[in-house]
Structure formats: C-alpha cells, structure tokens
C-alpha cells in the first residue's frame, strides 16, 4: 500500500507561495486522497491569514489550496500518542514545540508520513516518519 502524508504548515505555506519547484512537482504526483491536513495545521494557517494585512487574499488562497481536503480532527488515538511521545521527549530533555508535538502525534497515531521543512525538531520523535519535499529529502 502506498504511503499517505500529513502536510505540515510550512509545507502548505510554501505551496501557497508557489515554491519551491521540488515541492510543487511532488504534490501533483500524489493522489489527493493520500494528502492529509491536520485541523491543528489548519488552525495555524488560519491564524497566519488573519494576522496578514491582506486577510481577504490570504483566506481565499488558503481555501483554494485546502479545498477538498478534510481536516483530521484530533481524536483519542492522537491524544494517547501525544502522551507517549511527550513523556518520552521529556525524559530525554528534548521536547519540541507544543503544536509540532500535537501534529507529530497525529502522524504517528495514524501511520502517516509527515511532510515538513522542520525535520530537525520532528526527527526527535521516535517512530515518526518524515520527509522534506522542499529539499528533496
């Protein structure tokens, strides 16, 4: 079975900007039903749009890009994965940002590959598969 992917906010922001080519080329090769959006990522993106001086344009661009993508709600299985991951990271003294931790937990719980340009933080999470489509890694 082919991998399914969870797109991080930095990946979607780059796609909204129309760059880099490596990311855009990869996105068009993946079937839409294999691309997932976390409700947490959508909240981050909506916040960015609302803080923009050009809110209307940012809202429209975000809606167009995410049209057809059903945001994954944060469910009980995600919460349990979050608890395991956070406890493990705290034991190592290697905690990551709170929203990144929630997003990583969703990816782990649902066996999704997280697509992000922030691999340095995400690679601290045991069991998280992640890729960087912006740099071809």
Task: Annotate each language-model stretch with its function.
Residues 1-37, 49-64, 136-137:
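Short, well-structured N-terminal submotif of metal-dependent ribonuclease cores
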Residues 2, 104, 108-137:
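Acidic, PIN/NYN-like endoribonuclease modules and their adjacent C-terminal/linker elements
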Residues 3, 69-115:
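Active-site neighborhoods of divalent-metal-dependent phosphate/nucleic-acid chemistry enzymes
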Residues 8-9, 45, 82, 107, ...:
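Generic structural signal for small/hydrophobic residues in well-ordered secondary structure
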Residues 11-12, 41, 78, 103, ...:
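Alpha-helix capping/helix-boundary segments
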Residues 12-13, 43-46, 72, 123, ...:
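Nucleotide phosphate-binding site architecture
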Residues 26, 39, 61, 68, ...:
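Residue-level recognition of specific faces of alpha-helices
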């Amino acid at each position: 079975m082919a991998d399914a992917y969870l797109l991080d906010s930095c990946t979607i922001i780059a796609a909204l900007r129309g760059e880099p080519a490596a990311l855009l080329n990869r996105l068009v090769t993946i079937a839409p039903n294999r691309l997932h959006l976390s409700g947490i990522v959508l909240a981050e993106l909506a916040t960015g749009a609302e803080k923009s001086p050009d809110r209307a344009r940012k809202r429209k661009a975000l809606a167009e890009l995410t049209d057809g993508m059903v945001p994954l709600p944060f469910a009980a299985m995600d919460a349990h994965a979050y608890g395991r991951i956070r406890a493990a990271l705290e034991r190592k003294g290697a905690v990551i940002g709170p929203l990144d931790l929630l997003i990583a937990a969703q990816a782990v719980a649902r066996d999704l590959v997280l697509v992000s340009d922030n691999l340095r933080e995400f690679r601290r999470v045991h069991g998280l598969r992640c890729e960087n489509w912006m740099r071809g890694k």
